[in-house]
């Protein structure tokens, strides 16, 4: 069977819980790694220069800061974020259509000013740490979790951005409503037998791809492994 995609291009490795030195040591062990995720922890620790350092090592960067503020602030933040060269940038869908539109317009402007292609903005729907029961009890939202995800994905699409972040459990329904090239990027990925940690809505890598995920965010299964290269290659092999 000939694959229509490169397994390594479907995986985004979350660089969480590490120092800068540990990040670069890990990357050296993963020559096939294409995508990395820079989240709040690493960005706060090392600042925007970490993105340049990763890109200098040939990596594509998913900047996962989940911007959520008034439209003007979101626009200014995404304008600066786009100048770093990150290929993917997250905003919270709950910021609303106007905020998402301002973020997208400003990101395009920021990238253009430094001669870079515009990043893809992705709207976070409902965090994968939320379960259905907690979602209703703690937030008091009188919608099912699935309904909320669909509402926010529709909002993201109507705002003209390139995709959204959702759990793999919602992907199949969303993919019917939002065909490619709309991106559906999914955390909450665990191979069979792996610890689910603080995730609630999870799938295996192959299940998520088959359901319609564009890319999968993986992390501790690789970063906490005694042999990260073997762990990464094992996940890739599950997609073949």
Curated annotation (Swiss-Prot):
PROSITE patterns (alphabetical): OMPDECASE (PS00156)
Q: Which InterPro entries match?
A: Aldolase_TIM (IPR013785), OMPdecase (IPR014732), OMPdecase_AS (IPR018089), OMPdecase_bac (IPR047596), OMPdeCOase_dom (IPR001754), RibuloseP-bd_barrel (IPR011060)
* Subunit details: Homodimer.
Q: Which GO terms describe its molecular function?
A: orotidine-5'-phosphate decarboxylase activity
Q: Where is the active site?
A: 66 (proton donor)
| Pfam families the record matches | OMPdecase (PF00215)
- What pathway annotation does it carry? Pyrimidine metabolism; UMP biosynthesis via de novo pathway; UMP from orotate: step 2/2
Entry function = Catalyzes the decarboxylation of orotidine 5'-monophosphate (OMP) to uridine 5'-monophosphate (UMP).
Listed binding positions for substrate are 16, 37, 64-73, 128, 190, 199, 219-220
- Name the keywords, alphabetized: Decarboxylase, Lyase, Pyrimidine biosynthesis
Q: Per its record, how is this protein called by name?
A: Orotidine 5'-phosphate decarboxylase
Q: Which GO terms describe its cellular component?
A: cytosol
Q: Which organism is it from?
A: Prochlorococcus marinus (strain SARG / CCMP1375 / SS120)
């Amino acid at each position: 069977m000939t694959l229509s995609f490169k397994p390594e291009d479907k995986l985004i490795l979350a660089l969480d819980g590490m120092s800068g030195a540990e990040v670069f040591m890990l990357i050296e062990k993963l020559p096939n790694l294409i995508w990395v995720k820079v989240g709040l922890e690493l960005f706060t620790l090392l600042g925007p220069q970490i993105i340049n350092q990763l890109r200098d090592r040939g990596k594509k960067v998913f900047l996962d800061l989940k911007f959520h503020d008034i439209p003007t602030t979101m626009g200014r933040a995404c304008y600066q974020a786009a100048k770093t060269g990150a290929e993917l940038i997250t905003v919270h869908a709950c910021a609303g259509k106007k905020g998402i539109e301002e973020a997208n317009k400003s990101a395009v402007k920021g990238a253009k000013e430094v001669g870079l292609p515009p990043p893809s903005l992705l709207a976070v729907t409902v965090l994968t740490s939320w379960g259905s029961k907690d979602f209703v009890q703690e937030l008091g939202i009188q919608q099912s979790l699935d309904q909320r995800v669909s509402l926010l994905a529709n909002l993201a699409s109507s705002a003209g951005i390139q995709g959204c972040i959702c759990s793999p459990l919602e992907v199949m329904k969303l993919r019917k409503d939002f065909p490619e090239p709309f991106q559906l990027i999914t955390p909450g990925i665990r191979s069979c037998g792996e610890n689910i940690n603080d995730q609630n809505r999870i799938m295996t890598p192959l299940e998520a791809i088959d359901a319609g995920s564009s890319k999968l965010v993986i992390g501790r299964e690789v970063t906490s492994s005694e042999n990260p290269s073997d762990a990464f290659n094992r996940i890739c092999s599950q997609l073949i």
